[in-house]
Amino acid sequence: MTYALPELDYAYDALEPHIAAEIMELHHSKHHANYVNGANAALEKLQKARENGEIGAVVTALSKDLAFNLGGHTNHSIFWKNLSPNGGGEPTGALAEAIAKEFGSFEKFKDHFSAAALGLQGSGWAVLGYDHIGGRLVIEQLTDQQGNISANLTPLLMLDMWEHAFYLQYKNVKADYVKAVWNVFNWDDVAARFEAATK
């Protein structure tokens, strides 16, 4: 089975004016598609290397390649669902309670998550996740597409901080992009992920 580019639940222009249609189209149809193709290519090369008895010579490079591209595919697949033209506002129910318990209030959570996004050095993601060992919400910075994040973390909310996610519209003013996405975060999706993670 190969990976495939998922369809979006909304049109490319549905998140305007917060995220421009041009960004969405390039981001989904080009950048995300490249990660899908890269993950499939890495899997194919790994399979051939196993069959040919050459896995020892290529495993390190291909494992890194697979992690990067599969990370890109996974991260974007979550990110698209985390966004909605009907998004914004604040979460409710169990997710809202967990956020208040862990971070003190929604506003403090928002400040923390935004700071994590803006504090990334280079490319990466801000991630709100559920830590299964601690049984709590945590905010982490994911570097590139796959690094510097806890293995026991289930991502609930992800914000792409690669330049391709914002530069055409917001140029180098990342803070304006981060401020804008709060208007399109899909709290229903985040809440569903939280419910599934805590079962």
Curated annotation (Swiss-Prot):
Q: Does the keyword Hydrolase apply?
A: no
Coiled coil located at which positions?
Answer: none
Q: What is its EC number?
A: 1.15.1.1
Q: Which cofactors are reported in the record for this sequence?
A: Mn(2+)
Q: Which residues does the annotation say bind Mn(2+)?
A: 27, 76, 160, 164
Give UniProt keywords alphabetically. Manganese, Metal-binding, Oxidoreductase
Name of one Pfam family that matches: Sod_Fe_C
Q: What name is this protein filed under?
A: Superoxide dismutase [Mn]
From what superkingdom does this record's organism come? Bacteria
State if Manganese is listed as a keyword: yes
Entry's cofactor comment: Binds 1 Mn(2+) ion per subunit.
Described purpose of this protein according to its UniProt entry: Destroys superoxide anion radicals which are normally produced within the cells and which are toxic to biological systems.
Which PANTHER family does the entry link to?
A: SUPEROXIDE DISMUTASE 2 (PTHR11404), SUPEROXIDE DISMUTASE [MN], MITOCHONDRIAL (PTHR11404:SF6)
Q: Which family does it belong to?
A: Belongs to the iron/manganese superoxide dismutase family.
**What GO terms are given for molecular function?**
metal ion binding; superoxide dismutase activity
Catalysed reaction(s) here are: 2 superoxide + 2 H(+) = H2O2 + O2
| SUPFAM superfamilies attached to this UniProt entry | Fe,Mn superoxide dismutase (SOD), C-terminal domain, Fe,Mn superoxide dismutase (SOD), N-terminal domain
Disulfide bridge map: none
Leading EC class: oxidoreductase
Q: Lineage of the source organism?
A: Bacteria, Bacillati, Actinomycetota, Actinomycetes, Mycobacteriales
